[in-house]
Structures are given as C-alpha cells and as structure tokens.
Swiss-Prot record:
Function: Formation of pseudouridine at positions 38, 39 and 40 in the anticodon stem and loop of transfer RNAs.
Cross-referenced CDD domains: PseudoU_synth_EcTruA
A Gene Ontology molecular function term of the record: RNA binding
Alphabetical UniProt keywords: Isomerase, tRNA processing
Protein's organism: Methylacidiphilum infernorum (isolate V4)
Assembly: Homodimer.
GO biological process: tRNA pseudouridine synthesis
EC number: 5.4.99.12
Annotated residues for binding of substrate: Y114
Name of the molecule in the record: tRNA pseudouridine synthase A
Reactions this protein catalyses: uridine(38/39/40) in tRNA = pseudouridine(38/39/40) in tRNA
Top-level class of the enzyme under EC nomenclature: isomerase
Active-site residues, record numbering mapped to chain: D56 (nucleophile)
Species classification: Bacteria, Pseudomonadati, Verrucomicrobiota, Methylacidiphilae, Methylacidiphilales
Length: 255
C-alpha cells in the first residue's frame, strides 16, 4: 500500500560539544547526520532532513527545528520516541508534528532567537565548562545593554560577519530584540532577528564584552558598526557559549 507523503516538523535540542556543527560533512559527526541516520533506520531508506539554523561546531541548541517529507508511517508521538531511541543521548527530539509536505524549517522561518551564556566571576563553575564563556574580570552589564541597543532595528551587519574569502550578498538584517540579563555570576545575552549572518552573534558578543570590560567605548563600537567593515578591534566569542534558543514561524504554521 502506498502511503501519502507528508511533512514532519521536529523541535530538538542538542549539546554541540561532540559535533562538527549541524551540517553534514562527510563522515564527521554532525547533528544533521545523526538525525538523518535515525530517520533512515525508521523508514529504511535515506531521507534528507533540513534544519532551521546551521549551527557551527561546538554551538548548542535548545530549540532547533528540523523538517523532512516522508510517507506517513508513524504518528508524531511514536515518531518522537523512535527518533530518541536511535539518536545519541546528546540529541533529543521534544516535539514532532505533521505539517504540509512543502514546509521548510529553514525557509519558512520568520525569526530566530539565540542566547549566549557568560560566566562573570574570577572562579569558573566547572558545571558550565563548555557551556558558557568565562570572563574573570567584572563587566559593566548596564553599559553592555546600552551598547547592545545600537543593534536594534534594520541595519547592515557587514562588520559583524566572519566569512573569509566569501562575499556577503545581503548583510542587512533586522534585530527585533537584544539585551543582557544577570542572574548571579551568569550573564545571558538574548538576540532575536529575522536572520543572522555567519558568526554574527558571536561577533556581537565579542564586541559587547570588550565594551563591558572598558576596552571599547560605545562610540567606537558605533563607528565600527557604521563603517560596515570587519576589523580586528574585537574577536568573536567562542562557540561553546552559544545556543539556538527558538525559531518562529507564521501563525498558521505554528500549530
């Protein structure tokens, strides 16, 4: 019996430490490869799986979204259990649902939210090793929040992209929300936008940490931003503090 092909939408989280990013890279361990291998075991054939965000090596996710089209073989709750059975423990599917087969986790997304974790204390909490960037010197988080407001709205983010040798076709993005929040020694940076350039969030964090440490003024950051050129005034924050927190879709695709 031929089963109708439907779309499947998955929401998943993963610890990025043991992966070379999301995207398949030959035989290297990647999240996409792990997910496609799990799907192939269930359907007994190779099926491509698409991700909303192509996270880099070492970057984590709390709310990555993936999609694929396949014959309707399992109900969503059964599919979720089957995928988690086949996936490594560092990848978990939290939600599975049936959507139109044309649904694209990547191209139908209207915004993404990333979170970056900083541990601001002379002594690093060992439980946050590989999960947060250790900044031993005290930071002025209020000043960092003031500088972060420069990013709000529609701007050219060419100064915050790291893509050696690759021209950026359209460096304009709209940042919808951008702020720091302190909880004890933990400092959270949340940023929501309609899209992100390569390493854009990590470059933003790298620059804002320099502001917080008094090594870069808000005016200097504003000048770098307006010049629209990547310079060596700041280094990108390391990947292990970054999390893909959530992906948003049009209301009719959220059900």
């Amino acid at each position: 019996m031929n089963l109708a092909v439907v779309g499947y939408k998955l929401t998943l989280s993963y610890c990025g430490s043991g992966f070379h990013g999301w995207q398949r890279q030959g035989e290297l361990p990647t999240v996409q490869r792990a997910l496609e291998e799990a799907v192939a075991k269930i359907w007994e054939e190779p099926i491509p799986v698409e991700g909303a965000g192509r996270t880099d090596a070492g970057v984590h996710a709390k709310g990555q979204v993936a999609s694929f089209a396949a014959p309707r073989k399992l109900e969503p709750e059964v599919l979720k259990r089957a995928l988690n059975y086949h996936l490594p423990d560092t990848v978990r599917v939290w939600d599975a649902r049936i959507v139109p087969r044309e649904f694209s986790a990547r191209f139908d997304a209207v915004s993404k939210t990333y979170q970056y974790l900083l541990w601001n204390d002379p002594v690093m909490d060992p439980f946050y090793l590989g999960r947060a960037w250790h900044i031993p010197r005290a930071m002025d988080v209020e000043m960092m929040n003031e500088a972060a407001r420069l990013f709000l709205g529609k701007h050219n983010f060419a100064a915050f992209v790291s893509n050696p040798g690759m021209p950026v076709k359209n460096p304009v993005r709209t940042v919808l929300d951008c702020f720091f929040l302190e909880q004890g020694s933990l400092v959270f940076f949340n940023v929501k936008a309609d899209g992100f350039l390569y390493r854009m969030v990590r470059n933003m964090v790298g620059a804002l940490v320099k502001v917080g440490l008094g090594r870069l003024s808000r005016q200097e950051l504003k000048k770098i931003f307006e010049n629209q050129k990547r310079i060596e005034a700041f280094a990108a924050a390391p990947p292990w503090g970054l999390y893909l927190l959530a992906v948003d879709y049009p209301p009719d695709q959220e059900s």
